A protein has these predicted regions:
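Short secondary-structure junction motifs
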Residues: 25, 86, 182-184
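Conserved phosphate-coordination/catalytic loops
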Residues: 7, 139-142, 166
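Rossmann-like dinucleotide-binding domain that binds NAD(P)(H)
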Residues: 1-72, 78-84, 163
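C-terminal helix-rich "cap/oligomerization" subdomain common to oxidoreductases
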Residues: 68, 121-123, 147-192
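NAD(P)-dinucleotide binding in Rossmann-like oxidoreductases
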Residues: 32, 51-61, 66-143, 161
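Phosphate/oxyanion-binding loops and surfaces in catalytic or ligand/nucleic-acid-binding neighborhoods
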Residues: 18-23, 97-98, 175-178
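A general structural signal for well-ordered alpha-helical segments in protein cores
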Residues: 12-13, 142-146, 172-173
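Conserved acidic
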Residues: 4, 137, 157
Length: 192
């Protein structure tokens, strides 16, 4: 089955794909593991080691994804691991780099101000991008729901293009298929 990859992986994948313009996925080499979920010791403190026998989803997944535009994505997601986080999201471009701090739980936010690493007047500099504070009672999730409701009420366009959902899920499906095949696979997409 699908666990961390589909449950929380879709959100972190969406974040990085949005940051780079949602390019079309071409190939993927993927891996997934259920080591922690299948290990009875994981449940020992809860008194239910038998849960390991019925665990049926991944707790870790990783992939190397080739995207249109000669873009490479090194992707990792986990809900169980021997470290506090799989790490910040890092985008390395030819003109600059971007670090998006990780968060403990994906809730639509980031773990702190983002940093752009770039050259200004021949010098390497770091530019912090502050988190914009809102002065209303709505968080980012509330605002996303509101934009969807308004699109439905007013007959407007969906706030998230269907192609983005399609690409995101094609990558996740590709990770699963590549893991089963044991090698890189081509992502075949119908025209949309």
């Amino acid at each position: 089955g699908i666990g961390a990859l589909g449950d929380i992986g879709c959100y972190s994948l969406d974040m990085v794909l949005n940051a780079i313009g949602y390019p079309k996925p071409l190939t993927v080499s993927g891996y997934k593991s259920d080591f922690f979920g299948k290990n009875p010791a994981t449940y020992a403190d809860r008194g239910h080691p038998e849960y390991a026998d019925i665990f049926g989803v991944d707790d870790f997944a990783a992939a190397f994804v080739r995207l249109e535009g000669d873009i490479i994505l090194d992707f990792r997601i986990a809900w169980a691991m021997n470290i506090n986080t799989p790490g910040d999201t890092i985008i390395l471009g030819t003109k600059a780099g971007l670090r998006i701090p990780s968060t403990n739980c994906w809730n639509g936010s980031v773990g702190g101000p983002m940093t752009i690493y770039h050259t200004v007047a021949g010098e390497q500099v770091e530019t912090k991008i502050p988190i914009i504070e809102t002065h209303d009672s709505y968080n980012i999730f509330d605002k996303k729901v509101r934009s969807f409701v308004e699109a439905v009420q007013n007959g407007g366009k969906a706030p998230v293009p269907s192609s983005q959902i399609f690409y995101n899920q094609a990558i996740i499906d590709g990770i699963m298929k590549s893991h089963r095949a044991g090698h890189e696979i081509e992502i075949k997409l119908p025209e949309c």
